[in-house]
């Protein structure tokens, strides 16, 4: 009889099955098969927080099939993902199938290649109880908070609300940033720039100080004009000249959080979209000439470690493609930030076969997976390349009683930048190359320009900067970052506005209540300490029962006190005004948040119960009737779609997004589907690739 190998997904099963052959049957559990019940707390607080797991309702048939296969099998191996969630799935599978968790029936694959699968199969182990207990403790903590706190929010704010332990901290960060922006008072200042010539070349230097070295930054136009007047007739000469060399190092290969951040900045992906594509790359895709294989190592990792074998393969490719001089002459190492031993057992995210280039892979895959693979491959390869070498120069220009400064650099060896440089969210102060200069050299003033500026408030978080903030505060984890953002948006606490995260009126009301009644729940340091405690459980250095109890005792006391504090009180969530008028009574309509997002409701409620769907004009025209505007709408399940405003007279609808670009053939609205734009007008058939951003 064949041995039974159980993984999470059919895609992973297909790839692994190809490597294992006919002596093994590889099947999928389709994710978790057991969980805490939805209809009750499911935790016996009085008896050491014992969880009361039940089989997930729609998994009954699957569990029956797994049990039947297990009875016929010549052995069972649990090959779920190598992290907390994967260990929990294996623990529950072992429990259901009657396996001894202390026996070596657990295997893991850091990469799903022939070599990676062979290595995993050669090293079976017992289920890691500490790793499972870390997952179990997190699940119990989150259930205690959600199940106990949500009814409080129903009574004091609005029915249907829910609260989460980590999500509440994320909303707090976003709301705090919004308060900073609202309280920010811009301050005026002026830049004074001199464009200076030497021969046929010129450069720009900025006012920095007076002749004594005192920094100067004019606060208003009068001060700027006074400086301009003081510079009339002044000679501009090269006073101080500093030349040097610097080496710019590449960034390390990705971990989960940096992958999500870079994909957001460079590709415009949400964290969820990034992880979906990464999951596909890890579990396996069909590659021409190679068959089905996993293209990257496991994508949920905190570790920056790279195996010696992968480094050697990268350097071999670099030497062949770019030359020996592009290889880093020493072994690059990056210290993994506060990783547990279990977390650091993984590698960073890298291509499983470094020599498999994006150009070769692009023949077999496209869209998100192709873009993400190219980014992962390029970043990893660059991390093993030589530094970028630069000659630097900074100059202080003397002009009467004032000093101007400029700096620049020249690349003498491009090194890793020939392949990859990290994207940034903020506009960096750009250095430019300066013309050859000598100390004492007289410069020609071509233009003196003063420009009014104002200090800027801090920017709202993007997905990338929020993930970075969570990571820097010790809250983010590979398995939680993407779900956190999705959850707070789905719950109506946060919304996206031009790719920035903005708290809704509901989110601000809930955050204010949480801060007032449960300050420790939304405290960043408290949450970071809890994550450290979970890491200690994973490392076998802390008991999960005590960790949960320490938290719950304080939380239960806070909840009891909050009930007393808020007795007879309710938090009023301000309604968001709109320009719409109620069709039933003519009163103004306001924007409210319901189960499936925002909708319009009459401000005269409860006397008038008029409602409307909240629609958004996309700027496009219906390709079917050519008359109605294309409006963004939401389905009954909250999914966004686009339809003609003349419905039901015109029934055109699509899930694909209208774009501003018009059809080159007929002038109709174009729609985006994946990496292409297409015209939906009957008989046209025009298609084009999505234009690349500069």
Question: Where are the regions that the model predicts?
Answer:
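Metal- or metallocofactor-binding catalytic centers and their adjacent structured scaffolds
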Residues: 212-252
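Short, hydrophobic-biased segments on the C-terminal half of alpha helices
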Residues: 275-279, 485-486
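Structured, non-catalytic alpha/beta "coupling" segments that mediate domain-domain communication
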Residues: 14-37, 168-215, 383-432, 588
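Short acidic, hydrophobic short linear motifs in intrinsically disordered regions
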Residues: 238-241, 250-263, 290-299, 457-469
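Basic, low-complexity terminal or inter-domain segments flanking catalytic cores
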Residues: 2-3, 150, 183, 224, ...
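C-terminal or mid-to-C-terminal helical accessory/interaction module adjacent to the motor/catalytic core
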Residues: 112-194, 243-244
């Amino acid at each position: 009889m064949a041995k039974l190998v159980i993984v999470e997904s059919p895609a992973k099963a297909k790839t692994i099955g190809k490597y294992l052959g006919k002596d093994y049957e590889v099947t999928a559990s389709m994710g978790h098969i057991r969980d805490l019940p939805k209809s009750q707390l499911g935790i016996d607080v009085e008896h050491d927080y014992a969880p009361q797991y039940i089989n997930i309702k729609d998994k009954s048939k699957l569990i029956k099939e797994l049990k039947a296969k297990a009875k016929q099998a010549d052995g069972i191996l649990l090959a779920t993902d190598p992290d907390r969630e994967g260990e929990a799935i294996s623990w529950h599978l072992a429990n259901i199938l009657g396996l001894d968790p202390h026996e070596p029936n657990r295997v893991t694959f850091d990469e799903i290649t022939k070599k990676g699968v062979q290595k995993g199969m050669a090293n079976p182990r017992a289920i890691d109880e500490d790793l499972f207990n870390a997952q179990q403790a997190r699940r119990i903590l989150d259930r205690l908070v959600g199940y106990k706190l949500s009814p409080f929010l129903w009574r004091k704010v609005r029915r249907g609300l829910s609260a989460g332990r980590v999500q509440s901290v994320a909303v707090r960060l976003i709301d705090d940033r919004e308060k900073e922006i609202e309280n920010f008072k811009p301050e005026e200042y002026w830049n004074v720039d001199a464009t200076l010539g030497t021969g046929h070349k010129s450069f720009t230097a900025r006012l920095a100080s007076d002749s004594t070295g005192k920094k100067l930054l004019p606060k208003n136009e009068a001060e700027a004009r006074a400086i301009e007047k003081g510079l009339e007739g002044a000679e501009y000469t090269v006073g101080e000249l500093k030349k040097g060399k610097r080496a710019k190092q590449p960034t390390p290969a990705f971990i989960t959080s940096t992958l999500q951040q870079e994909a957001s900045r460079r590709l415009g992906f949400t964290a969820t979209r990034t992880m979906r594509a990464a999951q596909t790359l890890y579990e396996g895709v069909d590659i021409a000439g190679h068959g089905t294989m996993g293209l990257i190592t496991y994508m949920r990792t905190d570790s920056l470690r790279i195996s010696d074998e992968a480094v050697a393969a990268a350097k071999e490719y670099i030497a062949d493609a770019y030359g020996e001089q592009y290889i880093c002459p020493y072994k690059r190492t990056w210290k993994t930030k506060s990783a547990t031993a279990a977390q650091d057992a993984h590698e960073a995210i890298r291509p499983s076969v470094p020599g498999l280039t994006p150009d070769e892979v692009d023949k077999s895959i496209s869209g998100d997976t192709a873009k993400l693979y190219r980014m992962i491959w390029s970043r990893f390869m660059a991390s093993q390349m030589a530094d970028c070498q630069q000659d630097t120069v900074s100059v202080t220009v003397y002009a009467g009683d004032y000093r101007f400064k400029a700096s620049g650099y020249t690349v003498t060896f491009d090194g890793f930048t020939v392949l990859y440089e990290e994207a940034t969210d903020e506009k960096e102060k750009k250095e430019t190359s300066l013309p050859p200069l000598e100390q004492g050299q007289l410069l020609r003033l071509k233009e003196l320009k003063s420009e009014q500026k104002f200090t800027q408030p801090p920017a709202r978080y993007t997905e990338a900067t929020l993930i970075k903030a969570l990571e820097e505060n010790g809250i983010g984890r590979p398995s939680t970052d993407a779900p956190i953002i999705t959850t707070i948006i789905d719950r109506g606490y946060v919304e996206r506005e031009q790719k920035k995260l903005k708290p809704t009126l509901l989110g601000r009301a809930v955050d204010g209540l949480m801060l007032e009644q449960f300050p420790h729940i939304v405290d960043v340091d408290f949450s970071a300490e809890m994550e450290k405690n979970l890491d200690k459980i994973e490392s076998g250095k802390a008991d999960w029962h005590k960790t949960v109890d320490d938290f719950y005792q304080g939380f239960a006391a806070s909840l009891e006190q909050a009930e007393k504090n808020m007795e007879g009180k309710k938090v009023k969530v301000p309604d968001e005004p709109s320009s719409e008028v109620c069709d039933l009574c003519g009163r103004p309509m306001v924007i409210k948040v319901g189960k499936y997002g925002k909708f319009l409701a009459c401000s005269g409620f409860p006397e008038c119960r008029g409602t409307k769907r909240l629609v958004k004009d996309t700027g496009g025209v219906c390709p079917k009737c050519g008359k109605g505007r294309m409006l963004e709408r939401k389905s009954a399940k909250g999914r966004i779609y686009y339809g003609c405003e003349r419905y039901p007279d015109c029934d055109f609808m699509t899930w694909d997004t209208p774009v501003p670009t018009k059809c080159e053939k007929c002038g109709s609205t174009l729609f985006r589907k994946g990496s292409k734009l297409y015209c939906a007008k009957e008989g046209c058939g025009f298609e084009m690739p999505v234009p690349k951003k500069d």
